[in-house]
Amino acid sequence: MASVKLASLIVLFATLGMFLTKNVGAASCNGVCSPFEMPPCGTSACRCIPVGLFIGYCRNPSGVFLKANDEHPNLCESDADCRKKGSGNFCGHYPNPDIEYGWCFASKSEAEDFFSKITPKDLLKSVSTA
């Protein structure tokens, strides 16, 4: 009877060990993030999907992001996205090279004003010339 319990315990630990070691080295793309972190989510293997201008959640890059981008009223890749969604006329990209999308603003000056209040001045210069 003791050997059956011991064998069951060994199988349980072996199975658990297999699942735990499969994710070793893989990036954990869970939790809260900010599009202003560099890199967002602590690694460039994950994407920060904003739910607000300052806060988002980390996810693995996939088609899920594209769907979230299309559905979110303020996420954009171009000025045309903002006009199509009715969220503004200008797509102000985050001053973070790891974020390939932006946020809709009414105008370029509104975006520059907003980002100038929350980002270092030297970083803003490189963004406004892009």
Curated annotation (Swiss-Prot):
GO molecular function annotations of the record: nutrient reservoir activity; toxin activity
UniProt entry keywords in alphabetical sequence: Disulfide bond, Knottin, Seed storage protein, Signal, Storage protein, Toxin
Domain of life, source organism: Eukaryota
The record's account of how the chain is modified after translation: The C-terminal glycine may be removed from PA1b.
UniProt entry tagged with the keyword Disulfide bond: yes
Record keyword Metal-binding present: no
InterPro entries in UniProt: Albumin_I, Albumin_I_a
Cysteines paired by S-S bonds: 29-46, 33-48, 41-58
Signal peptide per UniProt: 1-26
Tissue: Major component of both the cotyledons and embryonic axes of mature seeds.
Propeptide regions on this chain: 64-69, 123-130
Record remark on domains: The presence of a 'disulfide through disulfide knot' structurally defines this protein as a knottin.
The protein's role, per its UniProt record: PA1b binds to basic 7S globulin (BG) and stimulates its phosphorylation activity. Involved in the signal transduction system to regulate the growth and differentiation as a hormone peptide. Toxic to various insects through binding to a high affinity binding site in the insect gut.
Further remarks about this protein from its record: The protein sequenced in PubMed:3755437 was probably a mixture of the products of genes C and D, PA1b being of C origin while PA1a is of D origin.
Name the record gives this protein: Albumin-1 D
Organism, as annotated: Pisum sativum
